[in-house]
């Protein structure tokens, strides 16, 4: 059924603007913390369709993340951008972002997982979402978060990371709980999440007989999908328009395969 919906979505996307996509700010909770997510969908489509959870990079739920949600909605998915930090908690600069992200990535990562689970729960509640087709994608910090979510045994069919944080040294044993198909999209020259970390994760996935793909983009560093990262690879993070386009196409092909 969704294959027909997806074909219709692609036709509509070709003839209409993403301005036709409906968006909503959604308040929800994890424990006592109020969170503020962002929902995007195409109201012209009828029937249940796959839902995609999106987890933001370390700067929090920003316009970049919202744009990605609208793009996915334009492809026929119900997209929900989760809020890991909390309503009104948004870093003002990289220093603040680094400190805040570290709070979630340190230790056993229970809070990070709980916040990601809260976002997935909110997505599952949506009546437009096909509950057997739940996907999660994440950028940088968010890539780490969606992998940690998958490691809880969450009912995800697919997980995609874009230049994701790959340090799972304290949680690598939980790879055995992953039920999802996994796609890692990564810069071959990423100094913040080096190839050695990716290879450690890959070994664990291979040992546990997971279905996974790892794609490295040559000449590409961290944050390669984000134009605000600038264009100087020597800084370790830089936008790469070619890798951005290729990784987006890799994701869309992968999710289309999962939607059959």
Annotate each PLM feature.
Residues 178, 184-186:
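Short beta-strand/loop motif that positions the catalytic acidic residue
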Residues 25-126, 226-238:
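Serine-hydrolase catalytic machinery in alpha/beta-hydrolase-like enzymes
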Residues 189-193, 222:
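Acidic catalytic loop of the alpha/beta-hydrolase fold
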Residues 155-165:
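A conserved short beta-strand
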Residues 128-139:
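Alpha/beta-hydrolase fold nucleophile elbow
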Residues 68, 194-205:
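Short alpha-helix in the alpha/beta-hydrolase fold that links the catalytic acid
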Residues 206-260:
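C-terminal catalytic histidine-bearing segment of alpha/beta-hydrolase fold enzymes
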Residues 138-142, 146:
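Gly/Ala-rich beta-loop-alpha elbow adjacent to hydrolase catalytic centers
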């Amino acid at each position: 059924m969704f294959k027909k919906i997806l074909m219709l979505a692609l036709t509509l996307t070709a003839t209409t603007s993403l301005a036709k996509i409906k968006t909503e700010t959604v308040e929800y909770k994890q424990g006592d913390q109020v969170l503020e997510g962002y929902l995007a969908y195409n109201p012209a489509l009828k029937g249940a369709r796959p839902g995609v959870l999106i987890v933001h990079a370390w700067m929090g739920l920003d316009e970049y993340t919202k744009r990605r949600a609208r793009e996915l909605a334009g492809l026929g998915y119900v997209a929900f951008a989760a809020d890991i930090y909390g309503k009104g908690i948004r870093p003002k600069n990289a220093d603040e972002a680094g400190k805040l992200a570290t709070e979630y990535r340190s230790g056993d990562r229970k809070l990070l997982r709980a916040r990601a689970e809260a976002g997935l729960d909110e997505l599952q509640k949506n009546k437009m979402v096909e509950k057997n087709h739940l996907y999660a994608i994440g950028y940088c910090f968010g890539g780490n978060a969606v992998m940690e979510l998958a490691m809880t045994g969450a009912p995800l069919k697919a997980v995609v990371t874009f230049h994701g944080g790959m340090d799972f040294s304290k949680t690598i044993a939980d790879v055995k709980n992953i039920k999802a198909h996994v796609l890692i999209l990564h810069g071959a020259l990423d100094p913040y999440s080096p190839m050695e970390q990716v290879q450690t994760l890959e070994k664990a996935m291979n040992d546990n007989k997971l279905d996974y793909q790892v794609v490295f983009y040559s000449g590409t560093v961290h944050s390669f999908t984000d134009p605000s990262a600038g264009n100087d690879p020597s800084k370790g993070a830089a936008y790469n328009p070619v890798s951005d386009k290729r990784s987006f196409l890799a994701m869309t092909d992968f999710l289309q395969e999962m939607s059959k």
